[in-house]
Structure formats: structure tokens, C-alpha cells
From Swiss-Prot:
InterPro entries: Ribosomal_uS8, Ribosomal_uS8_CS, Ribosomal_uS8_sf. This is Small ribosomal subunit protein uS8. GO terms for molecular function: rRNA binding; structural constituent of ribosome. GO terms for cellular component: ribonucleoprotein complex; ribosome. It holds the Pfam family Ribosomal_S8. PROSITE patterns: RIBOSOMAL_S8. One of its GO terms (biological process) is translation. The lineage of its organism: Bacteria, Pseudomonadati, Pseudomonadota, Gammaproteobacteria, Lysobacterales. Part of the 30S ribosomal subunit. Contacts proteins S5 and S12. It comes from Xylella fastidiosa (strain Temecula1 / ATCC 700964). Keywords: Ribonucleoprotein, Ribosomal protein, RNA-binding, rRNA-binding. NCBIfam families: PRK00136.1. One of the primary rRNA binding proteins, it binds directly to 16S rRNA central domain where it helps coordinate assembly of the platform of the 30S subunit.
Amino acid sequence: MSMTDPIADMLVRIKNAASVGKPNVRFPFSKVKLAIALVLKNEGYIFDAKVIQSDNSKSDIEVVLKYFEGRPVIRILKRVSRSGLRKYCGKAELPEVLGGLGVSIISTSKGIMTDSKARESGVGGEVLCFVA
């Protein structure tokens, strides 16, 4: 069965696993999903993200979730731009999450990065998701 929004599927898997206290979560590999997971790792929302080779020659991404005092570090994980309604922002309109306490993950011409790095680089792009 094909998936209409693989990024939304990845975000929901992470959110659901964190809400029930799982130590890690796996989902099918794609370069975009790996880039998003690495941004989450660099921002300190997860411990690790690595590519795992499955036995049927398809790769998976395994994300090791992070908890603080028994509660998940990721409180908000929301898909913004979706297949039915894309959301693009120029460098001046890039959204801040919770007044700068969270991050927006942006797909730019220079790669997938946070809103603050996109402002530093002077580029806009598609707003993929909000994380806090």
C-alpha cells in the first residue's frame, strides 16, 4: 500500500512512540526523513538517528528517543506543509515556534535546516514541521 505523506507518517510514529514511552522507533528510509531526523538530533530532541539495513534489502531509520524525568523531550511535533496544502515562506516570514523555544524545520534550496539556520543563510523554503 502506498503512503500519501511519508513525512507525516514519520512524525506520527515518533510522537506515538514517545507518548507511550518506547525507547526507539523505526520507519522506512528516505533521504528527506533522514535529514529531518538529523536536524532533530542536532537540536537535542532525540539521542540518535541511524540507518538500519533490514533483511529484505530495504533500509529503515531507527530513532532513539530522548526523555527528561520520565517525560518525552518532544512535546509538540506538528506537520505544517502537507501534500494537499503546501506552505512556503520567504526568509522574512519564517515562523518561530513558541516565541523561539521550539524550531521549525524548513526545506530550502540549501538543504533541510531549522528556521534559525535558514535566517542566517538568508533563504526561505517549505515549512515541513514544528517541533517543541
